[in-house]
Amino acid sequence: MADAATGKSLVRQQGKAYMFSSPAIAGGVAIIGVLNGTLEARDANTGELLWDYQTDASKQNSGWVLTADHRFNQPLLFFDNWREAPLLAQDRQVSVGSIFSSPLIANGVVYFGSTDGFLYALE
């Protein structure tokens, strides 16, 4: 958070993943979408995490396996070349519920969209 008049940083808090959206602030709480598929509510004055919500799609675990013949694999996908794996990893990160949009707060409900194709409404 920054002081609107001076631009000086008031709160700087390390998150679990990148945050590309602007926070929605109401009642002293800053709500922000995170690239790892969680929506975080933080105290606007201290940056303390108050609660978070994880999208269902972001809970999918697609662990990497290096097979005996030195191929990276993942369900339905196999690679002959390890250089292809980072490209898939980037695709997976964007396609499993990442939150790029800024949330909206109205009538006590937090609305946000996710790359899993859903619009969420949290009370």
Language model features with spans:
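Short, solvent-exposed beta-strand-terminating loops
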Residues: 49-69
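Short loop/turn segments that connect beta-strands within beta-propeller blades
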Residues: 3-7, 43-47, 123
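Repeat-blade elements of multi-bladed beta-propeller folds
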Residues: 11-39, 63-82, 92-118
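Short, well-ordered turn and helix-capping elements at secondary-structure junctions
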Residues: 6, 15-17, 57
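A short beta-strand motif characteristic of beta-propeller blades
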Residues: 8-13, 48-51, 86-92
